[in-house]
Amino acid sequence: MLNSIFIIFCLIAVSAFFSISEISLAASRKIKLKLLADEGSINAQRVLKMQENPGMFFTVVQIGLNAVAILGGIVGDAAFSPAFSALFSHYMSPELSEQLSFILSFSLVTGLFILFADLTPKRIGMIAPEAVALRIINPMRFCLFVFRPLVWLFNGMANNIFRLFKIPMVRKDDITSDDIYAVVEAGALAGVLRKQEHELIENVFELESRTVPSSMTSRESIIWFDLHEDEQSLKKKVAEHPHSKFLVCNEDIDHIIGYVDSKDLLNRVLANQSMALNSGVQIRNTLIVPDTLTLSEALESFKTAGEDFAVIMNEYALVVGIITLNDVMTTLMGDLVGQGLEEQIVARDENSWLVDGGTPIDDVMRVLDIDEFPQSGNYETIGGFMMFMLRKIPKRTDSVKFSGYKFEVVDIDNYRIDQLLVTRLDNKSNVPAPKLPDAQGKEDSAA
């Protein structure tokens, strides 16, 4: 009996090895293994190679687990049934004692295998899959060598079944932006990433999705020089609006000549020379980009052209705004470089905010914790959202209710929404989804 018990514990150990091997090799993260492989870990390279063809080691694992389970049942019955049968034979008939002995020995062996050969090793493998995989990879390679004929047979039959049902046989480990978002979110929740680091990483990915109008200075806010403007007017504009660069146009903003650098104008003033643009002031060529460009593409354009200032035009060759490298970096770095800028979203109290109409919709989503605005591809700013929902040129007191918030127009500047009051509704969870834009516009205009 002692020999049988020893054999059972050996079988449990073998089964535990296959269980921990299966879960650790399957759960090991490819990114972490690649880092270890780049540092020179040969075992990490071997684990990666085995993960490329998981059918091989899964076949070995299943052969081992099933063989050990069958042997465990046979040995367990032979080891414990006679002892239980002898014990129960004093109290019941031989037939009944044999049946009860078989049930008890089966339950005992099964319990031992479940606890020590399955649950415990698999939980260990899940806790530290990469560390375990690096330790068991060489014994697993030896098992692959020993069972190669059986592996070839069963793996070949499994591959034919996969081909029959057109199931891919290689695991796809393509990493998407959503995967990285999830990892970053998990890192923030776990405290591994600080709030600023979390926001910075999110902003990096937003550069690919946000277009230049979301960060530009809009057309009506551009301070520009007319080519024939007198010197006093130019000095007044420079004094009132101390920008580093000024657009130069001919009669109107849509006829662009170029731009002048404030440093060049200052040098002329210090040299007692005229600031008039037709008196020899250097007018530089302007980088012009379409309004469909993403911020990431705008960065590439700045790099290629060697500029940090660009004019944004729409499909009708009309100027819609200007964007600078600093605008893009402010979007990327947030508060780290935008300390001196006027806040676009100002909290009045814990349930209300004053929001600039030109605030990018992504910034509003982040502050108000709104997952998505309806048909957000049709607008870039919160003012655009209001016009889209109202289906008209907005006026003061016009409002829209969405996602548990009331968005109310409080200030208009030349038909443009200058400021909104956003209020959190008490019954946020019960607020219905917004109606179709036409219906919503009629409802709000009647309010």
Swiss-Prot record:
GO molecular function terms listed in the Swiss-Prot or TrEMBL record: flavin adenine dinucleotide binding
Organism of provenance: Salmonella typhimurium (strain 14028s / SGSC 2262)
Record membrane topology: Multi-pass membrane protein
Domain of life of the organism encoding this protein: Bacteria
Lineage, top ranks: Bacteria, Pseudomonadati, Pseudomonadota, Gammaproteobacteria, Enterobacterales
Presence of keyword Coiled coil: no
Family statement: Belongs to the UPF0053 family. PaeA subfamily.
Keywords: CBS domain, Cell inner membrane, Cell membrane, Membrane, Repeat, Transmembrane, Transmembrane helix, Transport
Transmembrane annotation, as ranges: 5-25, 55-75, 100-120, 142-162
Protein name: Polyamine export protein
SS bond list: none
Ranges for domain CBS: 216-275, 282-343
Stretches in topological domain Cytoplasmic: 1-4, 76-99, 163-447
Intervals, Periplasmic compartment: 26-54, 121-141
Subcellular location, record wording: Cell inner membrane
Tagged with keyword Methyltransferase: no
Deleted gene: phenotype: Deletion mutant loses viability in stationary phase when grown in acidic medium with nitrite. Mutant is sensitive to cadaverine and putrescine but not to spermine or spermidine at pH 9.
